[in-house]
């Protein structure tokens, strides 16, 4: 669709660029899109507007203040430090020069977080006699806060905005090819497009993207189930600057499209193929071999993938940039593939092998080679893993912050006692590890003796269906972990009491009655309320104990010391036991 131009208006052709943060009081919806949540290499360009009449000159006899001689780049940088749109508006009204250098900051990312705002912005964009050409000032447009309201008709005024760099339409399900195509046509500056969950979109829109958006760096079409290889191949051939590609749930995509991206888009840093169940080993091998800068590869539920995807990699290959690999539910992945992955990607930070049911201790021993690089590891439902492997993993990778061992039914207190030595552990998942007891929880709760770690770093602990746990361990955990914001105890009998479940969050609406009866998850303020309640309950008992204590405190201390010594001696008899005091950071 042809774009109309009114040359009498102010234009926003930018003589310079600034990468500084330029949007005061950003709305909540501004940072929700897939690309802006990450360190996107593409920064929105903010420039000065051009005057209506470029021949207007200042009176040569007029004495101007020094600030009038600053170049636009410096003025824009100064104005970008202002914290509110009201302050920017005040500056805009000072003089023509300030107006030209403020207006872009006000308009580059308009707040469309409610319907009234959106209507006002749309009206201003379509106004024929406005002082500025606002359509050319908008660089980021995010309509994801109005998912139920936005339709093809809503976006018609924005079809004039041909300098948009980031367009976010997440979950705007009423949009069709008509509305999205109108926004895309002529958008030569578009760098990031998020149309996730627009299930009515077809190849038509993606062909328009391929024709118009050769600067595109980020594309998120999660859930666009009607998109096929045909349009994706066109995108790969015309948008060769792509860095981030999210095809989560695009069920018709096959190796044909993925191989085309591997061949034509060498700058890809992140690719998500979750639930792309037609993708096979050939695609994975090609991506890992060809994309030297690849940082994230997500293959969750790509069930056709097996060991060959990694064993067929060239022996010399070293993917030193790869940081995240997600193989959730790739059930045919075995130990040999994990060994090859670790040797080829020695700097992996996040490794997800949840539901890779055939891996054993051998795979975990291979993961140990990642050492201090490993921060996040998910081994849920890997039921062949034993204590010895987990203990060695902790010894080798002491910077782990997140570990999930849900349904690893062979693990005992020995594993958790070793996990308790991790100085930076924030989240631990032990759901259905039914052999663990209060000894594990007391180990996690034990105060750190290392002065560099003043208190536990634990924030989320998942203990549902750990049926041997009692109030003693959990109470100690609550009091020792001030940062705790999530505690799941579903199915733990000691906590299915009405006076405690009142602090739980509501069960999800889709749960059955039986699931609701055992649901027990504390989060946010609920954790604090549970802690306070248990402490109040314990206070009378503590007072009673203090009233019957021996007068001879030295004798009592001596008895306690003997008991403590026996307990420590018993623990040390275990050859694989390590003192649970966290090591020095």
From Swiss-Prot:
Residues 1-10 have a biased composition (Polar residues). SUPFAM superfamilies: F-box domain, RNI-like. One of its GO terms (biological process) is ascospore formation. Induction: During ascospore formation within the cleistothecium. The keyword Cytoplasm applies. SMART domains: LRR_CC. It is found in: Cytoplasm. Residues 11-25 have a biased composition (Low complexity). This is SCF E3 ubiquitin ligase complex F-box protein grrA. It comes from Emericella nidulans (strain FGSC A4 / ATCC 38163 / CBS 112.46 / NRRL 194 / M139) (Aspergillus nidulans). The lineage of its organism: Eukaryota, Fungi, Dikarya, Ascomycota, Pezizomycotina.
């Amino acid at each position: 669709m042809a774009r109309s131009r009114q040359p009498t208006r102010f234009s926003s052709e930018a003589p310079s660029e600034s990468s500084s943060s330029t949007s005061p009081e950003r709305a909540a919806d501004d940072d929700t899109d897939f690309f802006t949540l990450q360190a996107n290499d593409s920064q929105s360009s903010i420039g000065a507007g051009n005057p209506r009449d470029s021949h207007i000159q200042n009176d040569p006899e007029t004495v101007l203040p020094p600030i009038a001689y600053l170049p636009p780049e410096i003025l824009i940088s100064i104005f970008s430090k202002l914290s509110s749109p009201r302050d920017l508006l005040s500056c805009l009204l000072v003089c023509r020069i300030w107006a030209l250098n403020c207006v872009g900051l006000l308009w580059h990312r308009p707040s469309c977080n409610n319907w009234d705002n959106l209507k006002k912005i749309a009206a201003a964009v379509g106004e024929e006699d406005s002082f500025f050409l606002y359509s050319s000032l908008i660089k980021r447009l995010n309509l994801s806060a109005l998912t139920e309201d936005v339709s093809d008709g809503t976006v018609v005024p924005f079809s004039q905005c041909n300098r948009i760099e980031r367009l976010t339409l997440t979950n705007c399900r009423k949009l069709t090819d008509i509305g999205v195509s109108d926004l895309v046509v002529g958008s030569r500056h578009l760098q990031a497009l998020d149309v996730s969950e627009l299930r009515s979109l077809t190849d038509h829109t993606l062909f328009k993207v391929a024709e118009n958006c050769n600067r595109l760096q980020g594309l998120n079409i999660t859930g666009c189930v009607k998109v096929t290889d045909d349009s994706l191949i066109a995108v790969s051939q015309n948008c060769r600057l792509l860095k981030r590609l999210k095809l989560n749930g695009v069920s018709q995509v096959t190796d044909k499209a993925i191989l085309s991206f591997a061949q034509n888009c060498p700058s890809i840093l992140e690719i998500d193929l979750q639930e792309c169940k037609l993708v096979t080993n050939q695609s994975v091998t090609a991506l890992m071999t060809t994309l030297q800068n690849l940082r994230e590869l997500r293959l969750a539920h790509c069930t056709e993938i097996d060991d060959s995807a990694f064993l067929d990699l060239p022996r010399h290959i070293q993917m030193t940039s790869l940081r995240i690999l997600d193989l959730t539910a790739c059930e045919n992945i075995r130990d040999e593939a994990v060994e090859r992955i670790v040797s080829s990607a020695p700097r992996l930070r996040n490794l997800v092998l949840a539901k890779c049911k055939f891996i054993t201790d051998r795979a975990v021993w291979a993961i140990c080679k990642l050492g201090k690089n490993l921060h996040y590891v998910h081994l849920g439902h890997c039921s062949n893993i034993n204590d010895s492997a987990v203990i060695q993993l902790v010894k080798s990778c002491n910077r782990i912050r997140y570990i999930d061992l849900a349904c690893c039914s062979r693990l005992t207190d020995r594993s958790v006692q070793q996990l308790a030595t991790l100085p930076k552990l924030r989240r631990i998942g032990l759901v259905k590890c039914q052999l663990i007891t209060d000894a594990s929880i007391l180990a996690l709760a034990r105060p750190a003796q290392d002065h560099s770690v003043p208190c536990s770093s634990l924030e989320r602990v998942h203990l549902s269906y750990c049926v041997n746990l009692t109030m003693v361990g959990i109470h100690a955990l609550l009091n020792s972990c001030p940062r705790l914001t999530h505690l799941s105890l579903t199915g733990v009998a000691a906590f299915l009491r009405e006076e405690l479940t009142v602090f739980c969050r509501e069960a999800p609406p889709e749960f059955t009655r039986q699931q609701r009866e055992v649901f027990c998850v504390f989060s946010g303020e609920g954790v604090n309320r549970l802690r306070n309640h248990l402490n109040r309950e314990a206070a009378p008992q503590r007072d009673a104990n203090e009233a019957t204590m021996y007068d001879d405190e030295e004798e009592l201390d001596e008895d306690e010391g003997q008991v403590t010594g026996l307990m420590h001696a018993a623990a040390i008899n275990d050859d694989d036991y390590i003192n649970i005091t966290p090591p020095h950071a």
